[in-house]
């Protein structure tokens, strides 16, 4: 049986986020009230509600909305909409990618500290995980030379969390170019 480590940040949020006076921990978008949702069309929600009221409630597209996939594909160069996988949040997307790509005995390099599931889920799948540490003196960037030393013949995946969680550091495309080109 696969054992996944206790997800520390989620446990902490479950305990404290609803009782906090000020919540500065969120990394998600602000939620909408029904009033906000109905007023998205700028017409007091009348047209939007009329359109919504006529919609058949069903399970939806199993592989994601074709229209949504078309729009997402336009954001990238040379990406076919058939290769877009729509998920409910990044957590689900991460789990799907890790379960699809990682096998026992694979080697994974994970930026650390980072989003816990990016190193604990590969471990739970039987992968050998090495941490690619970030450094305060380098503005919380990991070092490329450290990465080169971590790579093994069976390295299957390098996990980067961009923007980094917990530091918020954004790894620029320019910084990442040696990583993308070398590996």
Feature-to-residue mapping (PLM):
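N-terminal small-domain helix-loop-helix segment of the aminotransferase-like
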Residues: 2-89
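Generic structural signal for small/hydrophobic residues in well-ordered secondary structure
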Residues: 24-27, 72, 84, 108, ...
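Glycine-rich helix-loop-beta junction characteristic of Rossmann-like nucleotide cofactor-binding loops
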Residues: 75-78, 98-102
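Short acidic capping loops at alpha-helix termini that bridge into adjacent secondary structure
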Residues: 80-84, 104-107, 154
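Conserved PLP-anchoring active-site segment centered on the Schiff-base-forming lysine
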Residues: 100-122
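Short beta->alpha connector loops at strand-helix junctions that form conserved
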Residues: 112, 130-137
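A short helix-loop-beta submotif of the ANL/AMP-binding
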Residues: 123-129
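Active-site phosphate-binding strand-loop segment of PLP-dependent enzymes
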Residues: 136-183
């Amino acid at each position: 049986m696969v054992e996944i480590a206790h997800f520390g940040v989620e446990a902490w949020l479950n305990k404290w986020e609803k009782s906090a006076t000020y919540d500065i921990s969120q990394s998600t978008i602000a939620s909408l009230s029904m009033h906000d949702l109905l007023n998205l069309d700028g017409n007091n929600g009348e047209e939007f509600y009329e359109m919504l009221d006529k919609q058949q409630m069903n399970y939806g597209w199993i592989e994601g909305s074709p229209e949504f996939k078309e729009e997402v594909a336009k954001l990238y160069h040379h990406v076919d909409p058939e290769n877009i996988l729509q998920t409910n949040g990044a957590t689900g997307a991460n789990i799907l990618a890790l379960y699809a790509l990682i096998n026992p005995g694979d080697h994974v390099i994970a930026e650390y500290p980072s989003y816990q599931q990016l190193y604990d889920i590969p471990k739970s799948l039987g992968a050998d995980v090495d941490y690619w540490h970030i450094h305060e003196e380098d503005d919380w960037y990991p070092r490329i030379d450290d990465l080169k030393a971590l790579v093994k013949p069976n390295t299957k995946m390098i996990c980067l969390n961009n923007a980094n969680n917990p530091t918020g550091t954004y790894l620029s495309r320019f910084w990442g170019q040696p990583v993308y080109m070398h590996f």
